[in-house]
Amino acid sequence: MKKIKLFSIAAAFVAAFAFTSCNTGDDNNSYYQPLTQAEKQTCYFKTAGNRMSKLAYMSDEHVTAKDGKKEYYDTLDVVTSIHGEGKDTVMTVNNFPVKVFARYIPENADTKELKEALKKNELPVNFKSIVYYYSVTPVIQFMLFPDAISVNLEYGGATHKVKFYCYSSGNSRYTFGQVTQDKGKVEAYLVVYGYEVDPKDEKKPNPTAFNFNMAGTQLSNGTQIKFFQP
């Protein structure tokens, strides 16, 4: 399986997003103007369809050396599409291998059965994200507002509903999509930050944050996953 580096392309968007987001609250001193309908259509035509078929995620079980440095990423096949659904443009991910999240759940007695059940789960899941086109030049960029990712797991003598939560673009500058300048290919990034077992109130999530060791580094602020067009 091919290993790639997820974060190398994100920096340009982060800088642009951080700059414009600081200048949207004052109409007299605003650098950002919402896209026109024609510009949104241009963005849609450049991103719509079944373009992104690969998923990249952090994994210290898959290690490669590049230029003397170790990289901890793996790629898998997924089915991802962007289409207009009524008033909204939606990114739909099908065949998502939710078992990859097992490595990010804290290791303790309370989570042992959950982690084992998740590792063994071979049934992929589907989820959606609302797409909001943000920029058409110099790079087409879009915000993402993802639904929770849900799976039913059998363990401990019962069926449990487990939900995984992603930051929206409104809460994380590392959740976004774009068309690359060099090759004109579509890619999207999501930050998954936590999970909840058998939610008491699905309208008011109360997730447990991911907390995991990746190649000797303790991480507790989520993990970024990438969908991309090969």
Task: Identify the function of each model-found stretch.
Residues 52-61, 95-99, 145-152, 156, ...:
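Generic short beta-strand segments
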Residues 84-174:
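Predominantly extracellular/secreted and cell-surface proteins with exposed
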Residues 41-66:
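Tryptophan-anchored aromatic micro-motifs
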Residues 3-45, 227-228:
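Bacterial Sec-dependent N-terminal signal peptides
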Residues 61-73, 202-203:
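Acidic, glycine-anchored loop motifs typical of Ca2+
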Residues 42, 75, 88-89:
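Coil residues (strongly favoring Ser/Thr
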Residues 27-37, 164-168, 177-230:
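Edge beta-strand at a domain terminus
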Residues 77, 81-83:
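Polybasic, proline/glycine-rich intrinsically disordered low-complexity segments
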